[in-house]
C-alpha cells in the first residue's frame, strides 16, 4: 500500500512541473485576447462618439 502512495505522489509532482512550463503560452494567448478586446472597445466607442457629434451638430 505504501508503494502505491509513493507512485501517486510522484505522479502528481511531475504533472505540476509540466504545467508550469506552458505558462508563457497561456500568457501570450491572454494578451492577444486583451488586445482584441481593446480594439473592439476603441472601435465601438468611436462610432458612439461620431453619432453623438452628428446629433449635436444637427
Curated annotation (Swiss-Prot):
Example GO BP: sporulation resulting in formation of a cellular spore
Keyword annotations of the record: Sporulation, Toxin-antitoxin system
Cited InterPro entries: SpoIISB-like
Disulphide linkage map: none
Domain of life of the source: Bacteria
Glycosyltransferase found in the keyword field: no
NCBIfam families the UniProt entry points to: spor_prot_SB (NF041469)
Family affiliation: Belongs to the SpoIISB antitoxin family.
Function: Antitoxin component of a type II toxin-antitoxin (TA) system. Antitoxin that binds toxin SpoIISA and neutralizes its toxic activity. Upon coexpression with SpoIISA in E.coli normal growth is restored.
Quaternary data: Probably forms a complex with SpoIISA neutralizing its toxic activity.
Protein name: Stage II sporulation protein SB
Gene name per UniProt: spoIISB
Amino acid at each position: 500500500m505504501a508503494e502505491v502512495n509513493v507512485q501517486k505522489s510522484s505522479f502528481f509532482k511531475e504533472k505540476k512541473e509540466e504545467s508550469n512550463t506552458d505558462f508563457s503560452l497561456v500568457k501570450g494567448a491572454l494578451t492577444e485576447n486583451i488586445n482584441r478586446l481593446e480594439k473592439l472597445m476603441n472601435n465601438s466607442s468611436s462610432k458612439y462618439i461620431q453619432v453623438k457629434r452628428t446629433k449635436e451638430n444637427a
